[in-house]
């Protein structure tokens, strides 16, 4: 697969196009966006053709990157799959479990490579951690804390589709940022959450933009336990102060602890009692854009290389639409567990 088209011309599409430009034998055919002016601006920067019709872009491409708004993912992915094209769909997979199920079932019937945009699987420090877990260097794992804090809800004053109800909460901090963390926990441990153990909190702190009500969360906390007995804490935020922003992972094993924070991006810490060792993180190739964390741009490049390779070699593993469906299930369970909508009753103690 060489000829790749992109549906959508927003920020994530630009990250894909930047990464694609560094990959040998990969060609950006062009882009389709509902806003033709955005598409024209996109191709001036990245090359290719601005398509006025999504079907024409699909016909001209061997593989499609679906980087449109969440509520368009199902439509655009099915259009591409219907023409037997390879697909890489941005996260979250869809805006409902029903949509995700249709997408998964369609992909499974066809001889194409349908991948999810879970690019955090390709972060170097995540894969270092995975190797440490697999090789039992941390010992039996007790807990993982993974926090992703941004300030986009404070910076972005314009009301957009991310703030309204069309995406059914999937464009809030938990759906937008947390879906990566849900998949990452699965990628590291391959163990499901115990539903009864999960507690969730979702808040909307920036309540209006341009005098319109914001209908999604900008802060969420999740607590729960996996079936393999690992305790999990997930925090996502789009309303953090700059000094608190960043991406962090802490894993406690009975032998050692692993700690990483993008505030100190070039090292991760291995802690054994009082002994703390700073270990190097590989140097990144691409420059990360403002307000994104270390390794973010490289993760798109690795994701695309892997997806392209998978179209030529079946043994190459990719985050599949089945993985996307699983993460969508967990996300919807978290929504249902939100304490704002599901008050817990506390029995009196005599």
UniProtKB/Swiss-Prot annotation:
Signal peptide: none annotated. It comes from the Bacteria. It catalyses: D-glucose 6-phosphate + NAD(+) = 3-dehydro-D-glucose 6-phosphate + NADH + H(+). Keywords: Antibiotic biosynthesis, NAD, Oxidoreductase. The keyword Oxidoreductase applies. One of its GO terms (biological process) is antibiotic biosynthetic process. Induction: Induced by neotrehalosadiamine. GO terms for cellular component: cytosol. The keyword Magnesium does not apply. GO terms for molecular function: glucose-6-phosphate 3-dehydrogenase activity; nucleotide binding; oxidoreductase activity, acting on the CH-OH group of donors, NAD or NADP as acceptor; scyllo-inositol dehydrogenase (NADP+) activity. Its EC number is 1.1.1.361. Pathway: Antibiotic biosynthesis; kanosamine biosynthesis. Gene3D superfamilies: Dihydrodipicolinate Reductase, domain 2, NAD(P)-binding Rossmann-like Domain. The production of neotrehalosadiamine is dormant in the wild-type strain. A mutation in the beta subunit of RNA polymerase activates the production of the neotrehalosadiamine. Belongs to the Gfo/Idh/MocA family. Involved in the biosynthesis of kanosamine (3-amino-3-deoxy-D-glucose), which is known to have antibiotic and antifungal properties, and to be a precursor of the antibiotic neotrehalosadiamine (3,3'-diamino-3,3'-dideoxy-alpha,beta-trehalose (NTD)). Catalyzes the oxidation of glucose 6-phosphate to 3-oxo-D-glucose 6-phosphate. It can only use NAD. This is Glucose-6-phosphate 3-dehydrogenase. The lineage of its organism: Bacteria, Bacillati, Bacillota, Bacilli, Bacillales.
